[in-house]
């Protein structure tokens, strides 16, 4: 599984920008502040949220997320659009999501489209399923694959008759779920599952669409995101999310500090946390001069429903007392979080990890080493943003994406021309910033004399 490209329209400060991910397993996004690096992470995270299958989203969920989602729409625009191209097994999917604000200033899904093609050369996209919606429609329109492209049929009433009505699911229920930021394909999969479970007949075309939709939903489930918000919460000793992928389950568990009232875990969660620590400890001591992670547990309550535990994760150095990880440096906390997530892409070809500002709190030499190891051994895909340029010396040209402003538009570029294996890409990038030596990379222009004169003026006025 691999993300191939991403197009963002009216997303924050991006009017219409496309980024291709050429790297086999790693793509690092570099560039000046405000040039659309974090937007890439946020857009894919928004798609993950929209296509989420872990839990149904309701009005309470939307209340907490509404303002955040609305802030992603470019100022002065009525809608945003995200178009993601992702390769899954022998197929490539083109996934499109357009959302905007209705007259009540609420979020509204205007379009949800899925196209599919084979990974074979010369194959072309064909529609799998597409939802079209606006405030004037009594119900959304649904389009499926048509051999004759000139004939476009709305299949919503047919799907309602064949599937929704068979499950006694009303039109109002479907619209409510859509309004609460649930994807149509997740609703479709859920309704088809009920039909199959009850041994009712269903058309083959629906089963084929359902199979592909499940593949897409699982792929988004397998995308993990470490955002700046999560990193900040761990720094504030509020919660530290760790990723897990073991035989029985996969996902994320929030680790709270010892005195947090939410530091309460059942037996299954405790076993998962211990397993994560066991896996991380295979690499952690090798990168921290022998320090290992330990998990201390304490029984909180015993009831008929089971035992609840409070836990404390500690760091134990050779010949030293173990200390709470929250009393360690933010770098040690970040390394633990990062390694728990990296385990997935090291072991699984269907795992994707996105990390915003991966270099924050990580020693630059260690980070460069980790990225070099990952580029050689990662089975999954890593997409990250960063400012520290040292890793550029360890990555190949197809793993380095450079952002800049060109003609007032954010662009995502790669190094052009012939580049020998001995070329230092970090120095090449710095040269482009100083001398404008790369015609496709806009340098960060700093008016140095103006900066110095302004500083002198500021000092005079004190």
Walk through the language-model features, giving the residues of each.
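Short, well-ordered strand-loop elements centered on a beta-strand within folded domains, enriched
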Residues: 3-4, 93-122, 140-142, 301-316, ...
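A structural detector for beta-sheet-dominated domains
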Residues: 9, 22, 85-87, 98-100, ...
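Electropositive, glycine-dotted interaction segments
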Residues: 100-286
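Hydrophobic, Leu/Ile/Phe/Ala-enriched alpha-helical segments that form helix-helix packing faces
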Residues: 44, 48-51, 86, 99-101, ...
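Conserved P-loop NTP-binding catalytic core
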Residues: 22, 42-104
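Switch/communication elements of ASCE P-loop NTPase nucleotide-binding domains
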Residues: 1-54, 276, 305-451, 457-460
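Extended helical coiled-coil dimerization/tether regions that scaffold
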Residues: 250-327, 444-450, 454-462
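C-terminal intrinsically disordered extensions
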Residues: 120-142, 439-462
